[in-house]
Structure formats: C-alpha cells, structure tokens
Amino acid sequence: MELQQLCEGIGLPEDAYQKMMKEKEALNLSEMEKQMGRLAEAKTAAEAYRQLENCLGRDEEHMKMLSCQLVCVCRDYDRYKEKGISDEIYFDTMKCFTRFLGECRERTGTVVFDRGWWTYRQVSMTLFRIGELEYEMCRFRGKKAISIHIPSDADFTPEKVQESLKKAGEFLEKIYPDFADAEYFCESWLLSPRLGALMKDSSNIRKFQILFQIEEDMPQDKEYMEWVFGKMPDTPWQELPEQTSLQRKVKEMLKNGENLGAGAGVLREDYRMNSGNRQE
C-alpha cells in the first residue's frame, strides 16, 4: 500500500496530508526503523511508541508521529491480506486517524494529531473496527478479553450494534481463534450508573447499557466531557454548551456539584448468544 493511496482511502484532509508529508520528507525514516518495526508488534507497541516519541524530538503538531504511524499502516496492508482480513475492515479501522484529526480540529480549531498514544493499537493490529464498533484484543481480569470501543461516528442503533457484535464474533473465530471465546467488556461514560436516570428506556444509550453487567463504577472519571460536550475535562460548567437534552442534564449535574463519571461492564452472556458469539 502506497502512502498516498492510504491517505485517499481513509479520506485524510488535504491540509493534514500536506503537513504530514512535509514532516515526513524532512525525516530520516531509516533512523526510526527499529522503533517502527516494534510499533507494529502487539507486545512491544506501547514501549516502541514512547521510544519513537523521544527519537522524533520536537513535534508540536505530532505530524512526525503521524507520518511514522501511517508508514507502518501501509505495511500493515500486506499483513491484513496474509491473514485474510478484508479491505473494508482495513480502511474502516485506519479511518481512526482521519476521525481523530477531525475531532481535534472541532475541539481546538487546529490541525494536530493528538492520539498517537492510542493509535499504536491499530498499527499493531490489536484493535479493529468491525461495523460500527471497535474491538481490542487485550487482557481483563487476568484472561484474554475483547475491549469494546464506541467510535464517535458510530451508528448507535441496537440493530447496528448487534450486527457489529455478530460480525466481530465471526471475525475472531476465523482470524484470531485464541480470542473466539474471550469475554467482552466495555469501559465508558456510556456505562455510568448515573446515566440511566437521565435517559429514556427507549434511547439507544439505555439499550446499549442493558447489554452489560456493570461491575465497576468510576464516579470521578471525566472523559465524558469530550464526548458529550466536545470540551476538555477541566472546562468550567458555565462554559459548556446546552444544545442537546443530554448536555443540559449533565450540565445541571455539574452545576449541583455532581459528576457523570463512567462505568465498566461485561457483555451479558445471553446477549452474546443472541449475537451468535461463541461461549466458554
């Protein structure tokens, strides 16, 4: 996969592409080869990311990091083909780079790549987007597990969620059979125990919540600020928008000294059965 072909395939904005290419042309990628090779391997990706950061030096807009990661993504294409993973999953997975650039632009008005600390998961082929949801192969409670992530552009209807879960089960059974029977879990503001009182039972969020057995409450977590309001976690409540009913309700909580927080839950076995996923 050529870099230009990849960027066209994931819809990378032209201004971001030009910035990234300018930084890439100034880099000596051969000096980064060791770190880039380790970035592509699940066991060494996290450490390699930190080492690569140090090697790249000053990188205020993180376009050097973006260029290195996208070069690795180009190499991933052959690995996808060797495993029999479709082009659809490849491009859907790697569109995370475009999505994150867009989220940062919306939040700050700048073209900055601020998610390199996350996207090494896609680079190392431990996280895939299958339909509307993302699935990360990891460990949970000492065992192999699948962490479910909800992209900001996901169609969150119950039908699409169920379709994604079914396809993920089929994908794992075929491509990564060691994870076919793994437990599915999710850690998100969408699973906050306090969210249920703010939403109608007919809402997509409530229908997503009831798929999980909530096992941990994180009342101090504030990551929801970005997803609900598009703001940084330390933004004063007075400055938060009130364009949606959820924004208004959560803002009222903050005004009253409360916090939405987050929760962690395990996908209920009966729902896994209904989705066609295998059981232990």
Go through the PLM ranges and name each one:
Residues 1-156, 174-183, 197-280:
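Non-catalytic substrate-recognition and accessory regions of acyl/acetyltransferase enzymes
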Residues 183-185, 192:
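Extended, charge-biased low-complexity segments
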Residues 158-174:
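Well-ordered, non-membrane alpha-helical segments in soluble/globular domains
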Residues 152-161, 190-194:
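Short acidic, S/G/P-rich loop/turn micro-motifs used as interaction or catalytic elements
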